[in-house]
Amino acid sequence: MLVTPTDKNYITQVEVSVGRNNTSGLLLYYSEKAYAGVVSDGKTFTVYKNKDEKFTLPNKIGKCFIARIHNRGNNLVISVSRDGIDWMPLIENLDVSRMHHNTHLGFYALRPALVSMGRGSAVFSRFVYRNAIPAEKDMAAYLMVSHYDPTHSVHMAISYDGYTFTALNDAKPVIAGDTIADQKGIRDPHIFRGPDGAFYMSMTDLHAFGQREGFRETKWERDEEKYGWGNNRGIVLMKSWDLINWSHKNLRLPEVSKAYEDVACVWAPQTTWDAEKQKLMLYFTMHFGRELNKLYYAYVNEAYDKLESLPELLLQYPDPKSSAIDACITKIGDKYHMFYKTNDGRTGIRLALSDRANGPYELNGRWYDTSPVACEGPNLWKRIGENKWVLMYDIYGRKKHNFGFIETSDFVHFKNLGEFNEGVMKAVNFESPKHGAIIQITKEEAERLEKHWQTKK
């Protein structure tokens, strides 16, 4: 039996009862020359990575088992279970992206298939095919990404209630900046779950203390008088299906177009989904020379490694003496809400609204943060199962940095939740996080992260 899938992120599973002199299981099948999956004779599981590459594992379940394949954009997790509750992964992150007509000819799809081999018979039951993109009802935890000034790396923390966050890996980096960035350090990490269920993480390629750490001989990458504080020319893009294994691309603006050879900064990149264009939209702070910062946007491909359009102006602050930076765009209902930082009279957070992701945006004159000192890096996130939104921002205007939080249900009235460890929001094992972002994740995703980053006591 073959089934043609209609989703990029789906789960297919079936209960298999293997008879005598029989080997049966579940495959993703393109042709006789291209397939992947798992079969069993009741004694061993044989996992096919492709037609010519396979391995075996002991079958401790027996002749009756449930086989499951989770296809996440041609990235497979193949598992088996006795009861459909506890699953044993046999292989994870199996790439089947080359199982298509360009490689194997024909114009077929990679389809779920039930397979039975040998003289004996098999019984298949309870076949399942379903879209695997989690909805809010499936969420059970929160994931925060941020950077710390001492490490210039990606850090992660998890909360199960949206109030108390515990850093993974004992607050050490989960992705070291010097392994992914041209400047050997990153800032401003942002994470976004796309409509395909994948995770898209972007960050500034910039080490503010690169000279001190021995990564360069000058204070900045280029002349500060000509290009300004913290000058850089690129960003880092990373994509993952499981929050552990990440693809990685250094996007350098001068390589995108010669028009950006003199770009002075590319800061705080974030990603959203443009529902009208049906594309991932990357937006960021940028300026040339010593001009004021403006917000720009461009569309990025699904692989998250190439711009599909040149950057265009998203927002220029109307006061010619002030700039707009650090945008955070979230679609709520029919409106795109853009929180951003400006320095018009004070340095804090304002809001602009639009019917479209790429604008135009209508500004208002209200300040939203409650910080008595300068803040930046706004990030908006929703409490699971509640009509409550939390605006988090980076309070950098004091010696010891911290995150501030305000909460709203209508974006008119806001409740001040204070800062980490100075109110209801708690940071268990870390301090002084910088420019972060929070998303909802499932219990399975949270537990996978905790298991992967657990440290020995």
Language model features with spans:
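Extracellular glycan-recognition regions
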Residues: 1-138, 438, 455-456
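Structural motif
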Residues: 151-157, 210-216, 230-236, 291-297, ...
